[in-house]
Amino acid sequence: AICSLVLYLLSLMLMEKLSSNTVDAQEVELIWTILPAIVLILLALPSLQILYMMDEIDEPDLTLKAIGHQWYWSYEYTDFKDLAFDSYMIPTTELPSGHFRLLEVDHRVVVPMESPIRVIVTAGDVLHSWAVPTLGVKTDAIPGRLNQTSFITTRPGIFYGQCSEICGANHSYMPIVVESTPLAHFESWSSLLSSSSSL
């Protein structure tokens, strides 16, 4: 819209349909300034509203709290009682054959597939960032502040990510592994983990 207006006014000037006093006048400069500003405002207002609407999930099926520490992640399933764990990277010397070096963890985040998941992200010490690129998720973890993001997995699988904020010497040793499973498997996993943590 802005380019069209500029090209239209430029073509009028080149065809000399505007008088010489209009070309040098302030009216044209005023139009070139105000009209693009109005167009930008008309584009920005609905965009900002949609941006904030996309950030909110009305009723997620599961809420997960991810807390970044130097240099591991803590997870709390807030919809379950006593379902929390720490997730550390598996050292290369202890890594089973066939697993990814620097990406495998001792406790994966397990979520049910085809369910809206809300992730509340914070940090306990310094800035971190909870990022899983294949899910389109990246949220900064800031001490004393709760940020949120959401995602839905459409297929079972394992999704890898890492802390994407330089947070110290072992920054590259903070992998994130999200495992998407069918609902029945998730329910059995959560009940097994809840019963083992209560012992």
From Swiss-Prot:
Mg(2+) binds at E165. Residues 14-26 are mitochondrial matrix. Its EC number is 7.1.1.9. One of its GO terms (biological process) is ATP synthesis coupled electron transport. It catalyses: 4 Fe(II)-[cytochrome c] + O2 + 8 H(+)(in) = 4 Fe(III)-[cytochrome c] + 2 H2O + 4 H(+)(out). It is found in: Mitochondrion inner membrane. CDD domains: CcO_II_C. Keywords: Copper, Electron transport, Magnesium, Membrane, Metal-binding, Mitochondrion, Mitochondrion inner membrane, Respiratory chain, Translocase, Transmembrane, Transmembrane helix, Transport. One of its GO terms (cellular component) is mitochondrial inner membrane. Cu cation A1 binds at H128, C163, C167, M174. Cu cation A2 binds at C163, E165, C167, H171. The keyword Transmembrane applies. Binds a dinuclear copper A center per subunit. The chain crosses the membrane at residues 1-13, 27-54. The keyword Transport applies. SUPFAM superfamilies: Cupredoxins, Cytochrome c oxidase subunit II-like, transmembrane region. Its main location: mitochondrion. It holds the Pfam family COX2. InterPro entries: CcO_II, CcO_II-like_C, CcO_II_C, Copper_CuA, Cupredoxin, Cyt_c_oxidase_su2, Cyt_c_oxidase_su2_TM_dom, Cyt_c_oxidase_su2_TM_sf. PROSITE patterns: COX2 (PS00078), COX2_CUA (PS50857), COX2_TM (PS50999). It is a multi-pass membrane protein. Residues 55-199 are mitochondrial intermembrane. PANTHER family: CYTOCHROME C OXIDASE SUBUNIT 2 (PTHR22888:SF9), CYTOCHROME C OXIDASE, SUBUNIT II (PTHR22888). Component of the cytochrome c oxidase, the last enzyme in the mitochondrial electron transport chain which drives oxidative phosphorylation. The respiratory chain contains 3 multisubunit complexes succinate dehydrogenase (complex II, CII), ubiquinol-cytochrome c oxidoreductase (cytochrome b-c1 complex, complex III, CIII) and cytochrome c oxidase (complex IV, CIV), that cooperate to transfer electrons derived from NADH and succinate to molecular oxygen, creating an electrochemical gradient over the inner membrane that drives transmembrane transport and the ATP synthase. Component of the cytochrome c oxidase (complex IV, CIV), a multisubunit enzyme composed of 14 subunits. The complex is composed of a catalytic core of 3 subunits MT-CO1, MT-CO2 and MT-CO3, encoded in the mitochondrial DNA, and 11 supernumerary subunits COX4I, COX5A, COX5B, COX6A, COX6B, COX6C, COX7A, COX7B, COX7C, COX8 and NDUFA4, which are encoded in the nuclear genome. This is Cytochrome c oxidase subunit 2. It comes from Rhea americana (Greater rhea). The gene is MT-CO2.
